[in-house]
A protein has these predicted regions:
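Charge-rich, low-hydrophobicity low-complexity segments
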Residues: 1-82, 149-151
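Detector for repetitive beta-architecture
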Residues: 24-26, 56, 71-90, 94-96, ...
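Short, charged/polar "capping" segments at the starts of alpha-helices
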Residues: 35-37, 128-134
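Localized chelating/binding microdomains
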Residues: 137
Length: 151
């Protein structure tokens, strides 16, 4: 397991490795990261510390009490989600997000104004994935500035 991006990185290649099949269940950035000409692929099946299937992209830092202290923006050409139960936590992905695996959602932490956000389009592989996403509670849906569609 690769742990380089779990504590937060400011390097696209490290983040990419953290979200690869050989990565970790969680990957994080430690400041705004601009990779607007690149596609970030999320691959593999992972479990969190509770043993539940999950994959997390943390776009924030927090204090010792787990209160979010700063949120960040990850700018990419495209974020391609191929890991089940992947979620964006407390920050913004600027670029299109393409969902090819079940369970995609967002997370808002305690003490955060706003929510996980996509400044771009949210594109699902098929209608079944979009329908499942639309059934989520509003606090698990990501705010999207563009269109939410099926490709």
């Amino acid at each position: 397991m690769f742990a380089g991006a779990t504590a937060g990185t400011d390097n696209f290649d490290t983040l990419s490795k953290g979200l690869s099949k050989e990565g970790a269940w969680i990957a994080a950035i430690s400041k705004d990261l601009d990779a607007s000409d690149k596609t970030l692929n999320v691959e593999g099946d992972f479990k969190n510390k509770e043993g539940e299937e999950a994959r997390k992209l943390a776009l924030y830092t927090q204090d010792a009490d787990r209160k979010v202290t700063e949120r960040y923006t990850l700018t990419v050409k495209k974020l391609e989600v191929n890991s089940p139960q992947f979620y964006i936590s407390n920050g913004t992905v600027k670029g299109d997000v393409e969902v090819n695996a079940e369970g995609f959602h967002g997370q808002t932490g305690k003490g955060v104004d706003g929510e996980a956000m996509i400044d771009g389009n949210l594109i699902f592989k098929n209608q079944e994935l979009l329908d499942a996403y639309n059934k989520l509670p509003s606090e698990e849906q990501v705010k999207v500035t563009g269109e939410t569609t099926v490709k």
